[in-house]
């Protein structure tokens, strides 16, 4: 008897299949907050809209920066072969964390390049933008990276259009700054696929009260973080933090806030207990 193929309604079809490439010392919080909204979305939808698998450079289990060991399903070489068959994913995210500057696995860089060349979306979680840039994928592309890594990243990859935002989506390249910013980026992805109603329901399950915009600040407001109230000092620090990659001279900073260099030095010493040069 001829078997009639079972037709799956469009609303119940798989939306995205993802590979998470974990590298040594990857950020557990970025990894978990990227996967969990997808899991919650699947549960609320009642079907598998998102499917994922884990990989590491060698295919062996890998340690996060918090010491937790994670088992993976395959190696980079296996995932490179999967690009040629029906296991080809629709997105690949590389998840890294501290000491990303030391990561130099050529096979991983080649895999990310091949993935991108085949029109598959690629992304970086936490410091993953560093690895994407090392693979040659971020020239003239907007990207986000953790604020702590931004100065070094700007110096190492001057052609990357890096921003101190929570996340950036530039065509088919997705990057986020790490921490809980991965949650916001994935919620944006879910919203694109299924609309705001599902996003709101995922937020309710995750006990988060809002979806942050991509351009929201990474760090606490200066007043709260530093306990400083003087508007001129806050303006000076905002200028400094906006120009970490290419620091401005104190003369230029003074000019921007309409004070003399001497006034800025006295004010900074009074309010911060140190010179502008020591802070910057």
Residues covered by each model-derived region:
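Structural detector of well-ordered beta-strand residues that form the stable sheet scaffold
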Residues: 122-123, 144, 163, 174
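Residues that mark the start of a beta-strand
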Residues: 15-17, 142, 172
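Conserved anion/nucleotide-ligand pocket segment
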Residues: 164-207
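Extended, subdomain-level signal for the structured scaffold at the beginning of enzyme domains
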Residues: 1-122, 131-134, 191, 200, ...
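A conserved active-site-flanking secondary-structure segment within enzyme catalytic domains
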Residues: 138-166, 201-206
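Acidic/polar active-site rim loop that often engages polyanionic ligands
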Residues: 130-138, 182-185
């Amino acid at each position: 008897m001829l078997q009639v193929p079972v037709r799956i309604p469009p609303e119940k079809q798989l939306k995205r299949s993802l590979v998470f490439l974990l590298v040594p010392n990857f950020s557990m919080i970025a990894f978990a907050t990227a996967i969990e909204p997808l899991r919650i979305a699947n549960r609320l939808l009642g079907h598998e809209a998102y499917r994922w698998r884990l990989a590491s450079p060698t295919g062996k289990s890998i340690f996060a920066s918090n010491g937790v060991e994670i088992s993976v399903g395959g190696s980079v070489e296996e995932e490179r072969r999967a690009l040629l068959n029906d296991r080809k994913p629709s997105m690949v995210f590389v998840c890294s964390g501290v000491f990303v500057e030391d990561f130099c696995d050529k096979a991983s860089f080649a895999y990310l390049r091949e993935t991108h060349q085949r029109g598959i979306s690629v992304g970086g979680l936490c410091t993953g933008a560093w690895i994407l840039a090392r693979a040659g994928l971020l020239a003239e592309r907007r990207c986000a990276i953790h604020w702590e890594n931004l100065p070094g990243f700007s110096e190492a990859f001057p052609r990357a259009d890096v921003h101190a935002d929570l996340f950036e989506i530039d065509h088919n390249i997705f990057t986020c700054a790490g921490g809980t910013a991965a949650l916001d980026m994935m919620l944006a992805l879910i919203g694109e696929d299924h609309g705001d109603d599902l996003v709101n329901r995922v937020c309710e399950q995750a006990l988060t009260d809002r979806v942050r915009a991509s351009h929201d600040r990474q760090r606490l407001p200066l007043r709260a973080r530093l306990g400083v109230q003087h508007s001129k000092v806050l303006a000076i620090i905002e200028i400094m933090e906006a120009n970490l990659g290419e620091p401005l001279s104190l003369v230029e900073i003074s000019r921007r806030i309409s004070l003399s260099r001497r006034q800025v030095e006295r004010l900074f010493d009074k309010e911060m207990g140190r010179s502008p040069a020591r802070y910057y």
